[in-house]
Design a protein with these regions (language model features):
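Soluble oligomerization/assembly scaffold segments of membrane-associated complexes
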Residues: 123-252
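Bacterial N-terminal signal peptides that target proteins for export
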Residues: 1-11
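C-terminal membrane-anchoring or membrane-association module
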Residues: 316-339
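Basic/polar, acidic-poor N-terminal "presequence/leader" segments
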Residues: 26-103
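Juxtamembrane/start-of-transmembrane alpha-helix segments at the extracytoplasmic/lumenal side
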Residues: 300-317
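Signal peptide-directed extracytoplasmic domains
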Residues: 79-133
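C-terminal segment of classical bacterial N-terminal signal peptides
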Residues: 17-25
Length: 339
């Protein structure tokens, strides 16, 4: 029995390895499950830097009802570190998170746009979708001037306190994306050939292409991501605005995403597509001269390459079959020798 046990053991171990690699998908699906089950009433998370008076201001801005709603939370400073944010920094961004009445892309409303200086609502929507949210209503407020970059950590804190499991990889990629979007917007906002809606949709296309293109038996190289970013920027008429440095940053981010475990989350691409369509529909005539329905998913794919996981599974089945055949041949020969 030793040969067959050996091959069965290899097969089972490899199967569990594949399951482990898709743990991100299960973790992210639990995020939406928690939102649907536990956020019929909104949850409030207050920035860690606010004093008592500012807390009262913020709760009022977020329309908190003490008599009808559950107790609000203060952000734990140490929770910022998983997003690579300095826990000792000045964090005044606060959030309200609630289940949506209807299933639509993540909604973000900034009630103090004069104080949130670096991050727009759609930038937050983009990064929060990368974090793993599918459908939720989020309100952001700050009583003092703030970048807004720490709001995503407050959303994550609320979800984890309610039982969600969010991987560090999701957190880091979402925060890096938010910071990159904010930096590109800040440097290019006054250029005539720059448009924030186009930037957000371009980044969504980069994410879709990276996640779908990475799920194949082909090691993607830096030049593949460089070609992808160049093509997407040209498609959305941003190549004249985005600098070489920013292009390189987009290439690096896309490469990290493609090499992450996020490609095992089947709902993520679906969420990105829904968000893309929503932004385009609300952007007026900004996309009239752009082909927004191009085949984003295949930009990093090669048609003659089979997906990696099915190939691994097929290989394991072949090995198992060879093992069983070897065992039966060995057993038959042993019986003949005894005779």
């Amino acid at each position: 029995m030793k040969p067959v046990r050996k091959f069965i053991g290899i097969f089972i171990a490899s199967w569990f390895a594949l399951l482990a690699s898709s743990s991100t998908a299960f973790a992210n699906s639990s995020i939406q499950k928690v939102i649907d089950q536990k956020y019929k009433q909104p949850d409030y998370v207050i920035g860690s830097s606010l004093n008592e008076f500012e807390v009262e201001q913020t709760l009022s801005l977020l329309m908190y009802n003490e008599e009808q709603e559950k107790e609000w939370k203060t952000m734990n400073p140490s929770a910022y570190t998983s997003f690579r944010i300095d826990e000792n920094g000045d964090h005044s961004s606060s959030v309200k998170l609630q289940k949506q009445a209807k299933k639509a892309p993540v909604s973000v409303h900034i009630v103090t746009p004069q104080n949130i200086t670096e991050v727009t609502a759609d930038m937050h929507r983009n990064a929060l979708t990368t974090l793993g949210l599918e459908h939720a209503d989020i309100t952001i407020a700050s009583p003092t001037e703030a970048s807004g970059l720490s709001a995503i950590a407050a959303v994550s804190y609320s979800l984890e306190q309610s039982g969600s499991k969010i991987s560090d990889e999701n957190k880091i990629l979402a925060q890096e994306e938010l910071s990159l979007l904010a930096a590109i917007y800040k440097e290019n906002a006054r250029k005539n050939n720059f448009h924030e809606d186009k930037l957000n949709v371009a980044v969504i296309d980069l994410k879709i292409a990276a996640l779908k293109g990475s799920n194949q038996d082909k090691k993607l190289e830096k030049k593949d991501f460089q070609k992808l970013v160049t093509r997407i920027l040209e498609t959305y008429q941003l190549n004249g605005a985005i600098t070489d440095k920013q292009t390189k940053q987009l290439v690096d981010f896309t490469s990290k995403l493609a090499n992450s475990k996020l490609n095992s989350d089947k709902n993520l691409v679906k969420s990105f597509k829904a968000l893309k369509q929503d932004i385009i529909e609300k952007a007026g005539d900004s996309f009239n001269t752009i082909d927004t329905k191009h085949d984003t998913e295949s930009l990093l794919k090669e048609s003659d390459n089979l997906p990696l996981y099915p190939m691994i599974g097929l290989g394991l089945l072949i090995l198992l079959g060879i093992g069983l055949m070897s065992y039966h041949v060995h057993r038959h020969q042993t019986k003949r020798n005894k005779l």
